[in-house]
């Protein structure tokens, strides 16, 4: 009987201190700034700069993403909305592209005939590593992605472990 009482109390303590709410977004003090012109991803917290990593993109043209398939990296402020270990690119942190602001820019460019009428906005933009054993692509500034941001695999592992879902990411030229 004492054992049942002990297990009951232990269970109550466990469940009272357990949250079954899975947070979708973190109130992270970290934020990331990606500078396309410097090929650099920098991590900051409330106290300031923490670390920077070399990066590459999709296209040598550093302009803002216009439409799906242009291989350009979008500019603006985004949020990390998901993280996963990736079989091709080591780690992947998905961004919330396109945002409402991106959709507005896209529609305006379509109306102004800057982009083709049949163009789509695209999506699936994220931060990830390189193909296995191809970190040299970052060292040689080989822009190879479809618009994502690519780091060396050792660097993307560090970033993946440090950044929670909900981290703000600013991409600028």
Descriptions of predicted regions:
Residues 31, 52-54, 77, 124, ...:
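Well-ordered beta-strand positions in beta-sheet-rich domains
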Residues 41-44, 51-52, 62-65, 88-91, ...:
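Short, solvent-exposed loop/turn elements at domain surfaces
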Residues 37, 46, 55-58, 83-85, ...:
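Histidine- and/or cysteine-centered catalytic micro-motif in compact active-site loops
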Residues 23-61:
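A structural motif detector for short, solvent-exposed N-terminal "entry" segments of globular domains
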Residues 21-30, 57-82, 108-113, 153-158:
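N-terminal post-signal-peptidase region of extra-cytosolic proteins
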Residues 2, 12-26:
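Bacterial Sec-dependent signal peptides at the C-terminal "C-region" and cleavage site
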Residues 5-9:
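Sec-dependent signal peptide hydrophobic core
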Residues 84-173:
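Exported/periplasmic cell-wall-interacting domains
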């Amino acid at each position: 009987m004492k054992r049942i009482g002990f297990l009951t109390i232990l269970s109550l303590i466990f469940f009272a201190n357990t949250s079954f709410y899975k947070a979708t977004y973190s109130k992270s003090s970290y934020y990331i700034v990606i500078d396309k012109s410097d090929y650099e991803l920098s991590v900051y917290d409330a106290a300031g700069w923490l670390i920077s990593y070399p990066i590459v993109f999709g296209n040598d043209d550093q302009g803002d993403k216009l439409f799906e398939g242009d291989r350009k990296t979008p500019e603006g402020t985004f949020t990390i909305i998901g993280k996963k270990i990736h079989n091709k690119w080591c780690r992947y942190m998905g961004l919330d592209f396109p945002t409402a602001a991106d959709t507005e820019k896209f529609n305006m460019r379509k109306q102004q005939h800057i982009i083709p009428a049949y163009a789509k906005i695209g999506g699936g933009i994220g931060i990830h590593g390189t193909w296995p054993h191809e970190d040299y692509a970052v060292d040689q500034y080989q822009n190879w992605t479809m618009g994502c941001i690519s780091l060396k695999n050792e660097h993307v592992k560090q970033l993946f472990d440090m950044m929670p879902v909900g981290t703000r990411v600013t991409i600028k030229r």
